[in-house]
């Protein structure tokens, strides 16, 4: 989404006097302290309570399940937009507060069970080889990923507003590929022990900015380079091993477009079995993004159904690949009841076709949640989304 359209458990052994303890006590009741300083009994991992498990979110074995099965269990989603995707080291630069656990708790309490975290890496990555990412930035991202895991959510992390250096054009493609491969190698290594509830999304709306075809499917050369970017990134992720050998990965078309030529020319890297298709559909944009037209007539509904049918036909039926509609939504300038009706219809019809929806919330014109006081500015829309997904 273009923002300008809208706005350890550290092991802290307690010292104690050995002479006060019997050998049997030492063998059977060794203890460690939690972060609050209280003593808890050591247990095998499989015996940890839900409360104790939350201290090591994400750690676990990646299941060997299909991407269709994963998408089916994920549940309707919410975007943490205009936060980590800010094109600045200051992640409050676009007006949203630093993400708190209470914020993600509130999203889960509303009924959302998938958290997409859009991330812009450029300001926190060295521009020259080996393209090192600031380790503090990775740690900050991990903090929010863990908030999602602590809420038993699936979490998606991506490469978002990095089009300034990811350029699908001949003069830039080699450096773009090298830097993107390095980025995903570092990210995959950092999150290697996280289970399959963490999903990697290679690119967000990849395109050449400013060209005539920017939002209409792109050009043949650019679409080909995007395929190359995906393959390089998937190869980099898989090469890190561990859970990343089975990590589910999302790839997308030119600009995440549903234009037929963009979908037709997207190729699956290595015919990898754990690839999910990511698309964005603010349909129709004149209503969803501009509030220039009304929505709700039978012809409006038929047109939206045709859009969703086109996506299902291309990917689920013809190419046997699951789809996540990673961004959709409506701006607040539209009449509230129209937005509620649209959300209900959109999510219900998408779900009926096996398409998972993740609503765009930027904290601005597309906002649902007020991130400052954690109240829902548009609770009726959020409620409609959750209800329609069930």
Which role fits each region the language model picked out?
Residues 305-377:
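Substrate-binding cleft of secreted/luminal carbohydrate-active enzymes
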Residues 33-35:
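Bacterial signal peptide processing site
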Residues 1-14:
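N-terminal secretory signal peptides that target proteins for export/translocation
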Residues 97-98, 104-113, 132-159, 169-202, ...:
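An active-site-proximal structural segment forming one wall of the substrate-binding cleft
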Residues 178-293, 300, 306-331, 352-355:
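Active-site region of glycoside hydrolase catalytic domains
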Residues 43-114:
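N-terminal carbohydrate-binding accessory modules
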Residues 28-31:
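C-terminal motif of bacterial Sec signal peptides marking the signal peptidase cleavage site
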Residues 80-99, 127-133, 172, 286-304:
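Acidic/histidine-rich helix-loop elements
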């Amino acid at each position: 989404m273009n923002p300008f359209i809208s706005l350890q458990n550290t092991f802290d052994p307690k010292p104690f006097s050995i002479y006060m303890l019997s050998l049997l006590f030492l063998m059977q009741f060794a203890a460690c302290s939690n972060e609050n300083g209280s003593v808890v009994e050591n247990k095998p991992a499989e015996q940890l309570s839900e409360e104790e498990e939350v201290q090591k979110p994400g750690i676990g074995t990646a299941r060997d399940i299909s991407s269709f099965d994963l998408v089916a269990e994920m549940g309707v989603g919410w975007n943490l937009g205009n936060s980590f995707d800010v094109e600045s080291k200051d992640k409050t630069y676009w007006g949203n507060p630093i993400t708190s656990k209470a914020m993600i708790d509130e999203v889960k309490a509303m009924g959302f069970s998938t958290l997409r975290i859009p991330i812009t890496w450029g300001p926190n990555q060295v521009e020259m080889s080996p393209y090192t990412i600031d380790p503090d930035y990775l740690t900050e991202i991990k903090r929010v990923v863990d908030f999602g895991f602590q809420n038993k959510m699936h979490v998606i992390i991506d490469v978002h507003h990095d089009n300034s250096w990811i350029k699908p054009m001949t003069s830039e493609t080699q450096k773009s590929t090298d830097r993107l491969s390095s980025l995903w190698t570092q990210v995959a290594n950092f999150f290697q022990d996280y289970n399959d509830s963490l999903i990697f999304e290679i690119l967000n709306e990849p395109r050449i900015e400013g060209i005539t075809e920017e939002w209409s499917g792109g050009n043949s050369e650019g679409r080909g380079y995007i395929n190359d970017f995906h393959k390089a990134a998937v190869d980099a992720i898989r090469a890190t091993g561990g859970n990343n050998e089975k990590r589910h990965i999302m790839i997308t078309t030119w600009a995440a477009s549903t234009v037929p030529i963009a979908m037709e020319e997207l190729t699956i890297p290595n015919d990898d079995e754990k690839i999910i298709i990511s698309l964005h559909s603010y349909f129709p944009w004149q209503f969803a993004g501009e509030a220039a037209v009304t929505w709700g007539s039978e012809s409006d509904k038929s047109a939206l159904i045709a859009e969703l049918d086109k996506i299902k036909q291309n990917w689920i039926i013809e190419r046997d690949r699951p789809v996540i509609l990673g961004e959709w939504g409506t701006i607040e300038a539209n009449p509230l009841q129209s937005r509620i009706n649209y959300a209900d219809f959109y999510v219900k019809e998408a779900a009926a076709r096996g398409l998972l929806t993740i609503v765009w919330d930027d904290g601005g014109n597309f906002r649902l949640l007020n991130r400052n006081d954690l109240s829902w500015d548009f609770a009726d829309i959020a409620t409609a989304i959750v209800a329609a997904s069930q």
